Structure formats: structure tokens, C-alpha cells
Amino acid sequence: MFDKLQSIKDKYLTIEQQLSDPEVAADQNRFRKLNKEYSGLREIVRAYDNWRSAKQQLDETLAMQKSEEDPEMRALAAAEAEELQERLPELEQNLKILLLPKDEADTRNAIIEIRAGTGGDEAGLFAADLMRMYQRYAERQGWSCQTLDVSEGSVPGSLKEVSLEVSGHDVYGILKFESGVHRVQRVPETETQGRIHTSAASVAVLPEAEEVDVEIRKDDLQMDTFRSGGKGGQNVNKVETAVRITHVPSGIVVACQEERSQLQNRERAMKMLRSKLYDIKITEQLQSRADLRRSMVATGDRSAKIRTYNFPQSRVTDHRIGFTTHALPQVMQGELEPIIDALRMHDQAERLKAETN
């Protein structure tokens, strides 16, 4: 492992020199590519330097403990050595995690699709709650979150479905574990006898695809326009800015009506379509390589019940890892860090176990 770490550091230093070369700086494409690679290695190199520093300090402290004649100084050296011996395994574990193979899609932006499931109007209200939860979480992370398409439910404040585009640092890698069925248990406002109802909404998180990731033939597309905010067929009037695109071979349908111009809505709809097709492509590749792990945390199985939000008990339970918190109001306000951090740590532990085996 440490030979690999040293070679990574050597590569990091080489790229650092290249980035200061005026010829490289003049070639913007090459500069961006090198800078991205440099940024990707920085965390590993810093962790490796921390480990080396601690290891050197431990060696020096143990040597001092042996050679020191003053009992008081020997005791101080022994205490420092004990502290460093406890710290080194933690630093090594962190290095192992950083060396785990990266999912190329983790650094991408993401598209979140939320759909009301079983439970009627209450499911639609819960879908809207989930949308606000993710919007607030994105805001906490300093990400950009834009609505691509929304279909309102039959009661005020409810949603049939909504698509969000989230842009920022490592968005997909952080949000990918949110895919699945989210269940809510609470007393609806219309419930006169105080009975708890159970409803559900599904969440799908897709990595945003680039044009080079998937090939889409124009002949395979059917585009319809309609008036934003309402139903309509093609060419109803001159203010049809909303766009619906059907990918005929796959049957995938995407729509966008949030932008003011038809061109902008078409671009956003195509972005959604590319991401859906890219997601299918990646899933097929993983299955063909037998790399799709059975763990629900790993696969993001969208048919699996992953989490329950119990309002009477102020409890949120993630069933994949048995994680429970009684801070439901904070979670619904976007404070998802404890849950997401626990899921990511579990995934890292599972991957470390697989690497060891």
C-alpha cells in the first residue's frame, strides 16, 4: 500500500510542476484536465503526509524513550508514544478508504426524481416534503438546486412528481444512496379520529450525463410542446414553451416546463433524457461485470423500502443499516448529514471488506 502511496505522491508533485509550466497554462483543455487530476490526488497526498509525519514522530519518540536517562522525560516519551500508536491505525484506515476505487459518476451533478406512491393525497404531500428536504440540504451544502419539471397533485401543496437538478461538488456521490422508497407514518390533517396513515414516495437519483456518454439519434426522438402549467397538444398557440421528449426505442419520456423559453426547456429535457439513458447504460455495465453488489446501500434499488419517517415518534429509520435518529424535524429541514454520513461509512466498510477478501 505504501509503495502505491509514494507513487501517487510522485505523480502529484509532477503534475504540480506541470501546472506551473506556461505552455500547459496556455492549453486550457490540458490545464483543466491536469488541475482536476491534481485536485483528486490532493486529499490522498495530505493523508499520506500526515501518516508519514506521525510515523516519523513515533520512531523518534521510541528512540528517545530508550536513550533518555531522566525518568520524568522517559515517562513523557512513553505517554506520547502511546498516543501516536493509537493514532497511526486510524490514519492507516483513512488511507485505505481513500485508496478505494472511485466511482467515476460520483463527481457528477445529479438529477433527483420524486414520485408520490401509495397513500393518495398524503403521498403527494409527502413527496412535496421530500422535495423541500432535498432543496434545503442542497442549500446547506452550497449546491445549486433547480426544478426541471413538476406535476402538482389534486390537493394544494401536493405533488404527483418532480424532477430536480442539483449541481455542485461530488453531488451524485453524496446523494446516490437516497434512491429507493421512502415511507411516512403520520396523522393526516383531514383525519378526524387521529389514526396514523402510512404513505410512500419513491426517489431516484441519477448521475447527470454529458453528450459524449450516450449517443442519441434524432430519428429516435419525438418532441411535443405544450403550454407551461397546463395540458396541451402540439402547436396549440404561440406561447407553448414547455417541452416533452419521448425516446422511442426505450419508451422513456421526459418533460420540462420551468424555463421561459422553449429552447431552454428543450435543453433541460435533453439533459434529463441523457441522464436516464446513462443510468441504464451504467447499470447494465455493472451487471455484466458482476459488480452490482447485493447490498441495498450499494445498488440504490428503487423498488426497495429504504427509510421510514415516523412523525408521532419524531423518528427516522434507515432500514439498510439500522440507523435511527429522533431528530425528524431537523431531518425534514434538510439536516441529512448524520444519515448520509452513516450510509457512506457503511458503504466504505463494505468495500474495504470486499477488497480484503
UniProtKB/Swiss-Prot annotation:
Pfam families: PCRF, RF-1. The modification N5-methylglutamine is found at residue 234. GO terms for molecular function: translation release factor activity, codon specific. PROSITE patterns: RF_PROK_I. The keyword DNA-binding does not apply. Methylated by PrmC. Methylation increases the termination efficiency of RF1. It comes from the Bacteria. Its main location: cytoplasm. Keywords: Cytoplasm, Methylation, Protein biosynthesis. It is found in: Cytoplasm. Peptide chain release factor 1 directs the termination of translation in response to the peptide chain termination codons UAG and UAA. NCBIfam families: prfA (TIGR00019), PRK00591.1 (NF001859). Belongs to the prokaryotic/mitochondrial release factor family. This is Peptide chain release factor 1. It comes from Chlorobaculum parvum (strain DSM 263 / NCIMB 8327) (Chlorobium vibrioforme subsp. thiosulfatophilum).
